[in-house]
Regions:
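Extracytoplasmic beta-strand/coil segments of soluble accessory domains associated
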Residues: 34, 77-120
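Short acidic/polar hinge/loop motifs at secondary-structure boundaries
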Residues: 103, 120-147
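Face-selective signature of the C-terminal outer-membrane beta-barrel domain
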Residues: 261-277, 295-453, 459, 464, ...
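Outer membrane beta-barrel strand-and-loop segments of large Gram-negative receptors
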Residues: 356-362, 407-415, 513-519, 525, ...
């Protein structure tokens, strides 16, 4: 290990040192004027109305192409984790279970924030998680991030905010090839080619491949215990996180895309995207030979027509078909000693085929009347459909329990938005409202014994709800540099199809049931903030409050109750620990957000963020333990204090070096506060060097000091303790032609 670290240090020193030897000729790596916040040029397309960044009434950030090129992290989720109010731990998405690759904004929980890729949803249609693998970092132009309620624009998923990942524009000709290699045998290759077919059509063909051997994630450092030692909480023993048989969690993925830009006339343009995406990784724990895999086929397309100089119509549609195959490992462990008593085996598997289909039409008119500047009207529809077939297996591979369900959801939305910019006083107002009709049906729902024997069929009711999502935003331009803003909003989040149809577990012990009768969650929130921008930087401060009611949570069933009798039978042998999802929690999150950037000189620039978050439960319904889920206690997996500081140095116009420090304060994995996560800080660095006008080399290091620490997470068991990403060195190159 010492020799390896010395080799790494030599490589880092050699490349960093070479940066000072470059020519001072003009190049792309030098900092642009008004770096990162060219207020007159930055338009936030995620608003659906082309709002300039300086006119946003909610806390908004734009991660520019320069930010992406300078970030030590090599995946978009790990770049986003350094933004204020983003709760993503120090574990890259490819090291997580496919059903756990989510994002939490403002402490409101996973699957409550919308993520878009060029305006098309990237949230998984069944689990609500984020398919981060669909777009590699090399394809991204910039990332727009609006915090706070956006259900007025998009309906479902709009509680925490919206993240819109924009890919690079297609050119008439040219292309790009990039590649990288690093620690844990991690490699990434990406290539794209643009070509002009004729005056109507421009195409881009692109592909990228990713592979890693991964690393061991289960923790064996304090406060976790080391095998075979156990931790006793609430009278029960919890096994050590790292058990015999566990290993590195390898992963690989591939993306293949065909994109097109169309210009039918001077007034009418269009686009289309076709893609095939695959990803597979070892099951959590890194059990060799037990894999999980996903395959997606995607399509998106749209047309925009200018009616006149001030108005246009857009029509878009998208489709995604996904197949998810999962296997889970079981390690036989003695309940009295906590020791492993035999080899691990495949304890369960399940197959989830599902799809999502949607379309929208939008009319925009920049009326520029005396009191009205813009009108936006929109209508959209979406359907999600899925089935789940879960099988529980014995150590010999024999089926001992089966559950099957099929369901679908429909969303129909109407949206209207008005914008006004007064001349008498420097006040801008945005008033938007959206009405959504939500429907869900689960026509098939049953659970049974071995190979589906003795099935118990449950009559699942159809669910329908109408949700109103208004939003009022105000912006007061006090001076050219200083503004004050505020917004109040209401939103909702429908239960995921996994909550409606996916039942799983071990018959006779712990079994978790889905609930087709779940209804949407509700959110009310408001925020106040201020932005100060000048030619050399900006400072943004925001305070917010958000309240979520009717939240979905796993509830413990009472033996013999009506709910128990509707899903449990003799073949399944439910136990006193069996759970079913219910709308049985309410929570409140409040906090302070700070973002800043400052160009110290033509050679030095610095960035910083800070987040303070208080997220607590405010109400518990039936089946939710007040001992495990006390009200008024900081929610597990939500650190109260987080911050980042970064600095970039440009020794020449062809080179730069970036270093950043990420700090996470003390937190807890559980809301009962029995599983602490100590505070930690990590250092990252990256160097870029332009060899020629079209060729750039880079070297990045995550966790530069190779600190061994536990990253924050949410769990009620110490088996949820995972280590943060170990020192990861990556060297790569990009060639643009």
């Amino acid at each position: 290990m010492l020799l390896q670290q010395r080799k790494i240090s030599v490589c880092i020193g050699a490349l960093f040192g070479s940066l000072f030897l470059g020519s001072t000729a003009s190049a792309q790596l030098s900092p642009p004027s008004d770096y990162g916040q060219k207020i007159g040029d930055v338009v936030v397309s995620a608003t659906r109305s082309g709002t300039e960044l300086k006119d946003m009434t909610q806390n908004t950030s734009v991660i520019t192409s320069e930010d992406l090129q300078n970030a030590p992290n090599q995946t978009v989720d790990q770049v986003l984790k350094n933004q204020s109010s983003v709760f993503l731990n120090d574990q890259p998405y490819y090291e997580k279970d496919p059903t756990g690759q989510s994002i939490n904004v403002r402490g409101l929980g996973n699957a409550r924030t919308l993520v878009l890729i060029d305006g098309v949803p990237a949230n998984d249609a069944m689990y609500g998680t984020v398919q981060w693998n669909l777009v590699p970092l090399s394809s991204i132009e910039d990332v727009e991030f609006i915090r706070g309620g956006v259900s007025n624009l998009y309906g479902n998923y709009g509680m925490g905010g919206v993240i819109n990942i924009k890919t690079k524009k297609i050119n008439d000709t040219g292309g790009e090839v990039s590649g990288s290699y690093g620690t844990f045998n991690t490699s990434n290759i990406a290539a794209s080619k643009d070509l002009k077919v004729n005056d109507v059509l421009n195409l881009r063909i692109s592909a990228d491949l990713f592979n890693t051997d991964g690393y061991v994630q289960a923790a064996n450092i304090s406060p976790a215990t080391s095998y075979p030692n156990r931790l006793k909480i609430n009278g029960s023993y919890q096994n050590a996180p790292l058990l015999p048989g566990m290993g590195p969690e390898a992963a690989k993925s591939g993306n293949y895309r065909l994109q097109g830009d169309l210009k039918f006339s001077g007034d009418t343009t269009g686009f289309f995207n076709l893609g095939y995406h695959s990803m597979s990784n070892l099951t959590p724990g890194g059990y060799s030979g037990i894999t999980k895999s996903t395959e997606e086929s995607t399509f998106a397309g749209g047309v925009k027509t200018l009616i006149d100089a001030d108005s246009d119509v857009k029509v878009n549609a998208f489709y995604e078909n996904t197949s998810l195959w999962q296997q889970n490992a079981t390690n036989p462990i003695s309940s009295t000693t906590g020791t492993v008593t035999g080899p691990y085996y495949i304890g369960s598997n399940y197959n989830d085929p599902y799809y999502t289909l949607g379309a929208s039409a939008q009319y925009t008119n920049n009326v520029k009347a005396s009191l009205l500047d813009q009108v936006v009207l929109s209508a959209d529809a979406r359907q999600n459909s899925a089935s789940n077939n879960s099988n529980t297996l014995s150590a010999t591979g024999v089926s001992i329990g089966t559950a099957y369900a099929q369901g679908q959801q429909q969303f129909y939305g109407l949206m209207g938005q008005l914008k006004s910019k007064l001349d008498v006083i420097p006040l801008e107002a945005t008033l938007a409202a959206r009405v959504d009709q939500y429907q869900s049906q689960v026509p098939t729902y049953w659970s049974g014994g071995a190979n589906g024997s003795n099935p118990l069929y449950t009559n699942a009711p159809n669910v329908s709800a109408t949700k109103l999502s208004p939003n009022l935003g105000l912006l007061y331009q006090a001076t050219k540099e200083l503004d004050f803003r505020g917004a109040v909003y209401q939103g909702f989040h429908a239960p995921g199809l996994n909550n409606l149809i996916r039942s799983y577990g071990a018959p006779g012990s712990s079994y978790s049931f889905s609930n087709p009768a779940l209804t949407p969650e509700n959110m009310f929130g408001y925020e106040l903030g201020s932005d100060y921008r000048w030619n050399s930087g900006f400072v943004q401060v925001t305070g917010y409050v958000a309240q979520v009611s009717n939240a979905v949570v796993a509830t413990t069933m009472t033996p013999g109750s009506a709910t128990w009798n509707s899903v449990c039978n003799a073949a399944l042998q439910c136990s006193s620990t069996s759970t079913i999802y219910g709308n049985s929690q309410s929570l409140q999150s409040s906090g302070l957000e700070l973002q800043a950037h400052y160009d110290i000189s033509s050679k030095w620039a610095t960035d910083g963020t800070y987040t303070h978050t208080n997220t607590v439960l405010t109400w518990l319904g039936a089946g939710v333990s007040p001992t495990l889920n006390p009200t008024g206690s900081q929610l597990g997996g939500v650190p109260q204090n987080m911050g980042t500081v970064g600095i970039t140095y440009y020794p020449t116009s062809k080179a730069n070096i970036t270093a950043n420090v990420r700090y996470i304060g003390n937190s807890w994995m559980d809301t009962q506060h029995t599983l602490p996560v100590p505070s930690y800080a990590t250092l990252g660095a990256r160097a870029n060097y332009e060899m020629t006008p079209g060729t750039t080399l880079f070297l990045s290091v995550v966790n530069l000091l190779n600190r061994n620490y536990i990253s924050y997470a949410a769990s009620t068991s110490q088996t949820g303790y995972i280590v943060g990403q170990p020192q990861t060195v990556t060297v790569g190159a990009r060639v643009v032609f």
